[in-house]
Amino acid sequence: MLVSVFTPTHNPEWLTECFHSLQNQTYENWEWVILHNTDKKIPQAIIGDSRVRVFTVPVQPDAGIGAIKKLNCSLCKGDLLVEFDHDDLLTPDCLETLVKTQKETGAGFMYSDFVNFRADGSCNVYNPYFGWHSYPFRHEGKNYTAMSSFAPTPDSLTEIYYAPNHVRAWTKQAYEKAGGHNESFKIVDDFELIVRTYLAGVKFVHIPKVLYLYREHKNTYSEKLDVIRNLQQEVQNKYVYDIVHLWCKENNLPMIDLGGRTGCPAGYKSIDLFEADICHDLVKDGIPFPDSSVGVVRAFDFLEHVPAGTPVINMMNEIYRVLAPGGWLISRTPSTEGRGAFQDPTHISFWNSNSFWYFSRREQQQYVPAIKCRFQAKRIWNTYPTDWHKEHQILYVYADLIAAKGQKLSGPMDI
């Protein structure tokens, strides 16, 4: 299998180090495809290697990195495309491990653990509070601290901070199936491509060892942090539920809609007192599913119809009980900060953003021992579902909670 390592560069300062890490590969059937977009010269030692192909292609000044990488990949001849930034390093067994893993698993996308290193030799070690695990790693006589990547589950795939990091490799078939890099993206292009790769049904495999060392520079992120945050939020908002639904399908987990007699989305089983897929009294008899057997519980315009106090606590405990580890509660409830919570005479419990603290924060839960559920608050926000709701000041609180049942979760865990 020919492996195409692709590298766009506007600054070849560290290319010699990159080249040395390629020369040291235990797997020898590779090509290095460099897309050169700078006046600075690439060292002759690199250009002189027959396995290196350099393309000097004028790129429009306003072209995004997505367009540049898509062009770079189009120039590759191999069956496996490996992303390699122009200032980073590969471990000697990187390409061999990728090829071996692809042949053994049939993966279309692979990623590994990684090291973030600085010029002074120190490492950027991510905070364990956000779910990160680290371990010691030695490379070329130097000691580093490696970061363990997260599994490809909805909690990690929906945030750039936890999504698959380097090394990242696509089979050419998987890359094309996903549509390649988005040419309109000037940043966050890799995250957006990873999400689309997953949604294309490509098999993901995490390789739990370090194959890549990422060089961090001063202000690597700080100058772009706001842009990154905003763009990743756009990607998340667009794809989050598609990712969750596909994860359920892959794991044969049903999706249920509580109080779903009306408005039940395709793919969900509705549960309600009557005229539903499952006719059942949820408040009286609980949720008619076994423990840890459900992928998503949808509760749109439902929680406010559960009596306050013990019944609401029991319902949240029930939702947690039936959710599989990593399963999602997707909820939408009229907020007390608008008129909707109180205007309907059938509403008998009242909710706002703070209400979900008791099910996702130890600080509040400790005062209500009857609450047994342990949720991670993935997203909680307030908005108007439609202009009509806005006109009539009917504000809703949305809460996406993830069932924490001992599995490794990305993001803060307060409970």
Predicted feature descriptions by range:
Residues 187-193:
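Acidic donor-binding loop at a coil-to-helix junction in glycosyltransferase catalytic cores
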Residues 95-137:
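Conserved donor NDP-sugar-binding/catalytic core segment of glycosyltransferases
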Residues 20-29:
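Short, acidic, metal-binding catalytic loop of nucleotide-sugar glycosyltransferases
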Residues 1-21:
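N-proximal low-complexity "stem/linker" segments adjacent to membrane-targeting elements
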Residues 81:
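Short aromatic/hydrophobic "clamp" motif used to bind/position activated sugar donors
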